[in-house]
Each structure stands twice: as structure tokens, then as C-alpha cells.
Amino acid sequence: WISNAVEGGVLAILAKTDPEAEPRHKGMSLFLVEKSSEFQVSKRMKKLGYKGIDSGEFVLDDLFVPGENLIGGVEGRGLQQILSGLELGRINVAARGVGIAKACLLKSVEYAQVRKTFGKPIADHQSIQIKLADMATQVESARLLTEQAAAAYDKGERCDMEAGMAKLAASEAALYNSLEAMRLHGAY
């Protein structure tokens, strides 16, 4: 499967170009491939979230790719090229998670100030304040981890661990705050 397989016209394909290379990952190269009759998408994959970019299974049938389509001009560096994008990808996912978590917090605060029980806004109840404080803590911790990873990336430093931690924390924050926001909006 590959991202943008259905809607994309040009795709990056990682292919084994030297079957004798040791270790085995050394014999992979990255190519830009235009979709053609030799490149067929067999089906669009169903996704739970992040539907802005499609994913699809594809079949390559006697596909010929000219050497000039080799990315970077050096054969055998494909896996390294693919892996080098993981840090930035994880930071981007973390940033989305922070945005979701923060939006849930802001909407929850807004609603808690308007919704009333027992004659006062629910924001005045300690149990709601604790919930909102926990949500704010999730946002800030995820944001700080994401900014730390992004700063390291911008400096050209290795940040695979930081990016992974930020992605995990921000994804968990987005889930936690989404569930808490639904609970808080229960009477909406």
C-alpha cells in the first residue's frame, strides 16, 4: 500500500535494485514513478482517521522505471531516504494531536462557562475544574514535547526519540481530551 495511490499522479516507490547487497536494506533505491498502465491501484483502503490523504493497494505489472527517476542520484540509499522522513512525519502528527487536544480544551472551557447546573456555570464546580486542569496539562505537555522535537529537527540534530515521544504524548492527549470533552458536553 502507499499514500496518495488513488488520487496521486506521481508516487515515490522503494524498490530492491541490488538483490545481492548485504545487509539486505543496502540494495534498496527510491524512485519517482508516474502512474501508468503498468501501475494499477487495486483498491482504496478504508481508514479510521486522517482521511485527507488516501491510501491504496497497488499492483506493479512489468513496470519499467528509467534511471533518471532515481531520487538522489545514488543507488542503494532508498531505505535511508525513507527513514529520514520519519522524524518530520512524527513531528507533524504530534502537532496535529496538540491542535486537536487544544481545540477540545477550548470548546470545553467555553461550554463550561455557559452550561448551568444548580444555578451556576458548571465551570464553578470543582469536579469540572479538575477535568479542565487535566485537559490543559495534556495540551501543555504534548505541546512542549512537540516544540522540543521540532527545535531539534530545525537545528539538524537527530531527534527520532524526541519525535516519537512527542507523537505518542500528543496522540494520547488528543484522545484523552476528546473523550473528556464529550463527557463534559454530555448535556449539550
For the regions a protein language model found, what residue spans apply to each?
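Short coil/loop residues immediately preceding or within conserved phosphate-binding loops
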Residues: 8-10, 42, 55, 160-161, ...
